[in-house]
A protein has these predicted regions:
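Residues at alpha-helix boundaries and short interhelical turns
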Residues: 34, 81, 99-100, 104, ...
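Interfacial segments of multi-pass membrane proteins
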Residues: 113-123, 239-240, 244, 262-277
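Transmembrane alpha-helix interface/packing and boundary motifs in multi-pass membrane proteins
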Residues: 93-101, 242-262
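Predominantly cytoplasmic-facing regulatory/coupling regions of multi-pass membrane proteins
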Residues: 1-91, 139, 148-249, 274, ...
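Re-entrant/interfacial helical elements at transmembrane boundaries that shape
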Residues: 104-116, 145, 254-269, 282
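Membrane-interface alpha-helices at helix entry/exit sites of multi-pass transporters
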Residues: 84-88, 102, 107, 116-133, ...
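Transmembrane alpha-helical cores of Major Facilitator Superfamily
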Residues: 95, 130-133, 246, 286
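Mid-bilayer segments of alpha-helical transmembrane spans in multi-pass integral membrane proteins
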Residues: 94-104, 132-144, 148
Length: 317
């Protein structure tokens, strides 16, 4: 990309993002007016404890899988950190990342917590980069298979047709395979970006990245599937979640608030009532976003209190 093309892209990126965001607000407002809120309240009240516990268990599994991204990072940087040190950092970072944006959770929180464990700034950046790669290459591999298989049928009138979605899926599969091929066959294994050396992982590590990343997205979909009407198929719910993730990234809204709901209702309102869909998504927000954030906040305050106690202990009288 030339400098002229790059500057033109930057100039148009913000207006296009704002326009997309406004479009989603209009869409969600129109949908909200057509939703039977009495049905939403009734559906929320009708949830069985067994259903909520299953969703909570799947949420815990998802957070543990995401925290394991940093275990790959430990191997990547070659620093002897214990899993008991890494998993809490991954859990806390993910909870803050989901609710307060990647800058707060993915970046700031990881830098603060890992620096307390004696990890250098360069190695923290490598762990962060590998975690992002694990998440999004896993997404591309899974979305590629789901989209290209035709499991998701786009409603009439949508800008992206089912055929176009299948084409996007095929492209994502090719990108995923290209990443694996690069990890196996590339002769150049290292690059320097702003003074930080980035090393291409081994094929084994790359396969583990794709597997864990795809598993986490699958578990997220399983939580939503558990809370939505029973007549919906899991592959369809998974596909819609993967589509909504793209919209969430484009808008940069923390937690994708409103975006997830607009996409799910827009794509599934012909399969189930809008009220039942929104009720399930509200329950999903509470179980997958709010509850883990509260737990992560307590964990983080505990880490800070422990660090403060150690500083006081080391300070001479």
């Amino acid at each position: 990309m030339t400098d002229h093309t790059g500057s033109r892209f930057k100039r148009w990126k913000k207006p296009l993002t704002i326009a997309f965001f406004l479009l989603l607000i209009v869409l969600f407002t129109l949908l909200a007016r057509r939703i039977g809120w009495s049905e939403v309240i009734q559906t929320l009240g009708d949830f069985k404890w067994r259903t909520l516990l299953i969703a909570a268990g799947l949420t815990l599994c998802s957070f543990l899988v995401y925290a394991c991204f940093d275990l790959i990072g430990r191997t990547y940087i070659g620093q002897p950190l214990r899993w008991k040190q890494i998993l809490p950092v991954g859990f806390i970072s993910y909870a803050f990342n989901l609710n307060l944006s990647a800058w707060v959770g993915g970046i700031a929180m990881r830098y603060r917590l890992y620096s307390r464990l004696g990890v250098s700034t360069g190695n923290i950046a490598k762990i962060l980069g590998l975690s992002l790669a694990t998440n999004w290459f896993g997404y591309m591999a899974l979305a590629g298979v789901v989209f290209s298989s035709g499991l998701v049928t786009m409603p009439p009138g949508w800008k992206v047709s089912t055929t176009a979605l299948q084409g996007i899926g095929a492209l994502l599969v090719l990108v995923s395979l290209g990443y694996l091929a690069a990890c196996q066959f590339s002769k150049k294994r290292a690059w320097s970006i702003r003074g930080i050396e980035i090393n291409l992982p081994s094929l084994r590590m790359a396969c583990l990245q794709l597997a864990l990343g795809a598993l986490n997205w699958s578990l997220m979909a399983a939580v939503i599937f558990t809370l939505l009407p029973a007549k919906l198929d899991y592959p369809l719910v998974l596909g819609v979640l993967l589509i909504s993730a793209i919209a969430g990234v484009v808008t940069h809204i923390p937690a994708g608030l409103g975006v997830l709901e607009a996409v799910f209702i827009g794509l599934l309102q012909h399969e189930a009532s809008r009220g039942s869909l929104l009720a399930g998504l509200i329950a999903y927000r509470a179980i997958y976003f709010i509850c883990p954030l509260l737990i992560a906040l307590v964990m983080y305050l505990g880490v800070e209190a422990k660090a403060k106690a150690l500083r006081v202990k080391k300070t001479p009288a």
